[in-house]
Amino acid sequence: MLDANTLAKGCALQPDDVYCLPLPRAAGVEGYYYARSMPTSLQLAQAAELFDAHPLVGVLGPALPLYAGCAAEKARRWQQQKPAVQAKLSALVCPLPLDETPPPLPNGGCLLVRGAAFPQGLPPLQTESDFWLVPLLAQYNGYASATFETAAQCAARADVLDAALAAQRGVGPVFRLMGRTVKNALRKRKESAR
């Protein structure tokens, strides 16, 4: 685990190592959830296995919690901090276009990074907006970002998905969906015949 002082200065990383970057601790309830999302020793071992099995994964972090408003809050923060992130990317000569959708990470607690994903090393990471750079720089260097969930999060996600799909289980929605599928297939066949 790299400490805050090392992260504040920026640092070179060994290509064969995996590093744990703790995010700045938030206050209040958010700080509680950030602390809860720190990986356990079992999760760290599983992350090392994942990095070994998937050589193009450069950044791994906890999934966004399924609490009401988490996704909206993340999107709001991204919009607020996006200009600063774009300026830092420009200063690092990293021409990545940014859109309205926030990167998949960071979501809290920490980020696990593969040293090889950062051949130029890590830039100074002091503020919350600095940590948006980590998955973006990995992407620029050809590496993907991935999230991990606990067993409880995975079960909760299945429950939420099941509830969302329940409305589509009636006869009416199924026939509407079938009708759209047939209509689109006929339209494509008609266009290809021209």
Residue positions per predicted region:
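ER/Golgi luminal nucleotide-sugar-dependent glycosyltransferases, focusing on the catalytic module
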Residues: 1-194
